[in-house]
Amino acid sequence: MALPIDPMEEPRMYQQTLLQDGLYDLLESDMMVDCVLKIKDKEFPCHRLVLAACSSYFRAFFKSGVEESKQREIVLEDVEPGVMGIILKYLYTSNINVTEQNVQDIFALSNMLQIPSIFTVCVSFLQKRLSLSNCLAIFRLGLMLDCPRLAISARNFACERFQFITRDEEFLQLTPSELAAVLASDSLNVETEQDVFEALIKWVGHDQENRIGDLPDLLDCIRLRLVPRDYFVKNVEKHEWLSSNPEITKKLQLVKDAHAGKLPELKKTKNKKSPSEEGQKKGDEEEVEEEEEQEERLPGILNDNLRFGMFLRELIFLINDSASVAYDPTGNDCYVASVSTQIPKNHCSLVTKENQIFVAGGLFFDEQSKDEQIYSYFLQFDPASSDWMGMPPIPSPRFLFGMGEAENFIFVIGGREMKEGENILNTVMVYDRQFLKWAESDPLPYLVYGHGVVSHNEMIYVIGGKGENKECLNRVCAYDIKTHQWKDLAPLNTARSLFGVTIHKNNIYVVAGVTDSGLTGSAEVYDIKTNKWSEFVEFPQDRSSLSLVSVSGVLYAVGGFAMFPKEDSDDLMPLEMNDIWRYDESERTWSGILRENRYASGATVLGVRLNTLRLTKM
């Protein structure tokens, strides 16, 4: 439904339309044309009044009184006719076709001609199309055209993705001042200051001969007080480019002194203030100058303000079809990460070693596909926008499958077909994160569903589940991505499915689940080095679909289903639990830390790192 027009604005809108349509009719009819812009071999008839009204450049030119301004034909040099034609059409019609191919030329010419409306259109166009491949180029363009809005937007976009843009050739082409604007930013999304220092060294090394002289000034952008002391001694203080430069060694001594608790004394300077009305006296009394004391600032190299990315916390991430919520077990705080409702029920989730978060599952219907119309959703969480991004869907819809990762690939393993018959699968689909494509990988040696999958050191482990006879399995298999082979490992002590599983301190932990005789709370741990399973502390309650995560070196169990008697009956029924438990290694016991978190209902659970500055505290 269209928004109502403001009655006060309605006459203005009608008059603007009438005026613009009338001017365009005059142009098309070649009436009252008093000016021709000649650009190379092209001529553009137009009206001086329109040019002067829309462009400060032409207004100043026509008012200058110079001989050229009085002539009917005005020659413009170093301008492309096609771009000028686009701009003139906009001045008469308000219509403009900005594309990725012409935006830079339109932007530059509108800047030269000082037409703010087109300038703003180009800025908005570029802001909406910021990407890893163009953000630094747009940042440099914004600086070149003196457009702070565009330069800051592009710089912030680049700072948000600092780890990625430093791999790009465009990063190595930045000028010293452009690089300083990035490295000095508080909004850098880095977990450690070492990353910023190493990016600077990489930039200098790209053209050492010409850039080594910029190092002393650029080093002020690095917050060396945030660097661990052992790293500072080994990688900073002893670096040949730094240790051989007297100016830099003096700065490094300031950092060493700061590490020892000694900061330079800051002198106070006095600034004269102009007299205020309160300081003025009646009559001929002299004005009194007030003096204000101002403290000097610390040298830039001693800046110890945390960067934006340094507010990352390890959290328990609960993902269900109503919201995505992060729980901090150390502070008992809960944060909203996303309120998106596009997450399918009965999904599977995965966090990669790079902390990328993916969700797969559910049914996705593609009406435009001629070959195959049914897919499974595949989504990736974007922390910057707090939303889930649609990725290429999984070609074969399935449920009760497992997800793992190795190198740059995500694996979807086994499960049951989301079709009539619900056939058990051994197929493996692999997603290439670089090329954003799905393909089929080496199949699992057996059919399985309801199993657990974990990844460690580029190996993918498939544990337990149910086989083709619907009986629980104790089988454990590992896939080596380098040899493309599946290999059987030591079996589970207890065959089970729908259990909690995670990597914790380089071992695989399995807790609770479903056995052929019912639910269990038993637990076991697999030593990857010795290929042996051993008993672990039993969970206090028999449960299925328990989630197990390792966060900040601590093991947590979340939710699941337990059996309870029905009212007025001895029959048992499953009841979903939404609690959170923590394992105490010193006491070797499980203890409940949160009785209920409603977002644990129907959720998959991950141990992730998220920036709490982005999240809304509940």
From Swiss-Prot:
Its main location: cytoplasm. Gene3D superfamilies: 1.25.40.420, Kelch-type beta propeller (2.120.10.80), Potassium Channel Kv1.1, Chain A (3.30.710.10). Residues 33-100 form the BTB domain. Kelch repeats lie at residues 356-408, 409-458, 459-506, 508-553, 555-608. It comes from the Eukaryota. GO terms for molecular function: ubiquitin-like ligase-substrate adaptor activity. This is Kelch-like protein 40b. Belongs to the KLHL40 family. Component of the BCR(KLHL40) E3 ubiquitin ligase complex. Keywords: Cytoplasm, Developmental protein, Kelch repeat, Repeat, Ubl conjugation pathway. Pfam families: BACK, BTB, Kelch_KLHDC2_KLHL20_DRC7. Residues 285-295 have a biased composition (Acidic residues). It is found in: Cytoplasm; Cytoplasm, Myofibril, Sarcomere, A band; Cytoplasm, Myofibril, Sarcomere, I band. Expressed in skeletal muscle. Detected in the eye at much lower levels. Disruption phenotype: Morpholino knockdown of the protein results in a curved trunk and small head at 48 hpf. Morphants show disruption of skeletal muscle patterning with an irregular, wavy appearance of the striated myofibers and extensive gaps between the myofibers. Myofibers show disorganized and irregular patterns with small aggregates of alpha-actinin, suggesting nemaline bodies. Animals exhibit sporadic muscle tremor and coordinated swimming is not observed. One of its GO terms (biological process) is skeletal muscle fiber differentiation. Residues 135-237 form the BACK domain. Residues 264-284 have a biased composition (Basic and acidic residues). The lineage of its organism: Eukaryota, Metazoa, Chordata, Craniata, Vertebrata. One of its GO terms (cellular component) is A band. Residues 264-297 are annotated as: Disordered. CDD domains: BACK_KLHL40_KBTBD5, BTB_POZ_KLHL40_KBTBD5. Substrate-specific adapter of a BCR (BTB-CUL3-RBX1) E3 ubiquitin ligase complex. Required for skeletal muscle development.
